[in-house]
Amino acid sequence: MSDSYDDFSLEKSKSQVKRELHALQDLGERLTTLKADLLAKLPLTDALRRALAEAPKHTANAARKRHIQFIGKLMREQDIEAILALIDQVDSSTREYNERFHALERWRDRLIGEGDSALEGFVELYPDADRQHLRGLIRHAQHEAAHNKPPAAARKVFKYIRELDEIQRGLR
């Protein structure tokens, strides 16, 4: 008698199955908001790619809801872990993205504040960095800071190190 009870406890309840299906629909809806270049990097089936491309065409509420449910159905066949890992890297609302963003801001501040000594450590982490170009951007940012000008060059430094980080992570 205990064997039948143990078998029953391993099955998912109807409520649990519904929660999982709704989670897949929510993930599918998040995918509809991603840009095409990011979608291309995700391991998705062709049917799901087509469904995601069609999603903006469905503007009526009922049609959109049905289409999101269809996307949720197609999501059952996907590698959800791989999709979530990539979304966490590029979605600005996730903790991982924010941590990486703040780390890059700290690098920018160190590079502008410390100059060449910080540049050596940065180049060790990012060997693809163009030292000469980065050194020029840093000097320009230091000059702007010394003369109380708007931080346009500091933004360029940040943009460049963010591009290097994305290249190293395989996002570009």
Curated annotation (Swiss-Prot):
Assigned protein family: Belongs to the DarP family.
Species the sequence originates in: Ectopseudomonas mendocina (strain ymp)
The keyword Transcription regulation appears for this protein: no
Location of this chain's protein in the cell: Cytoplasm
Any Gene Ontology CC annotation: cytosol
Primary location group: cytoplasm
Top-level taxon: Bacteria
A Pfam family hit: DarP
HAMAP family: DarP
InterPro entries the record matches: DarP, DarP_sf
Single GO biological process annotation from the record: assembly of large subunit precursor of preribosome
Its job: Member of a network of 50S ribosomal subunit biogenesis factors which assembles along the 30S-50S interface, preventing incorrect 23S rRNA structures from forming. Promotes peptidyl transferase center (PTC) maturation.
Cited NCBIfam families: PRK05255.1-1 (NF003593)
Protein encoded by which gene: darP
Keywords: Cytoplasm, Ribosome biogenesis, RNA-binding, rRNA-binding
Keyword Glycosyltransferase included in the entry's annotation: no
Protein name (database record): Dual-action ribosomal maturation protein DarP
A single GO molecular function term of this UniProt record: ribosome binding
